[in-house]
Amino acid sequence: PHPDALAFEVKEANGDHIGILYMDFHPRESKRSGAWMNSYRKQSALGKKVSPVITNVCNFTKPAGEDVPALLSFDEAQTLFHEFGHALHGLLSQCTYNKVSGTSVPRDFVELPSQIMENWASDPEVMKIYARHYQTGEAIPQSLIDKLEASGHFNQGFVTTEFMAAALLDMAYHTRTTTDLVNPNEFEKTTLDKIGLIPEIMVRYRSPYFQHIFAGGYYYAYTWAEVLDADAFEAFKETGNIFNPEKAKSFRENILAKGGSEDAMTLYKRFRGQEPSIEPLLKRKGLK
């Protein structure tokens, strides 16, 4: 690997080999922007056991000097947790066929393992563990945590509405029953009028530059993933311990290990004991 990259052997608590994880944190000329997870080798168990080789790739600024570590913004910390969730999905897979192992799941389910990790990133109990002053080691003060939480609630009514309007517009395009040509602007106006979108709130993407409409009507999956991750994290909170080992074991066995080998909602209900509720997401957004 590149000298900047770190390689880890991931093991079970008893020492058994799980897989290899590469962490490539910093930008360089040959890398594109953004952050992502890749599977260099997917897990499988057809005839012989094949362990996964996974990478997390980010573009975090390098340390400014020998005595200064790489300092992450809160958004970057969330990105790190998010991509690590995808990595866990790939590493902890226990499927027979690599075609359905790891992150090879329906598109509206693939973000659950990543987005649920962001809940720990923003939890005050966890932040006081990792969000520390790089010189003094002092944990982030509660006043800053409160401000971060308040900023997360800001304008959520507007943001949620524009996202949902775009999702409904996308779905309208993909549920048309005729092949007649339509004027995109007229179709958009008719659709948004039907759902009652007020003029003061514009759909997140106008039709002429709404690239997602060419990807199979999946734009709703972004919001649906939020419903799933908020409800799944609620399962941990309900135990009174967000690190509850039994609940974590259930999430691993029923979600992470299964990949796309079974129906996604069946797996979710097996973990959660019920269908996902929208209430935890509304509460997290400050809408209820």
What are these language model-derived features?
Residues 53-56, 95, 258-260:
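Short, hydrophobic/aliphatic alpha-helical segments
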Residues 1-4, 9, 13, 17-20, ...:
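C-terminal, non-catalytic "cap/extension" segments appended to globular domains
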Residues 1-4, 9-78:
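Active-site-adjacent "gating/activation" loops or surface patches in catalytic cores
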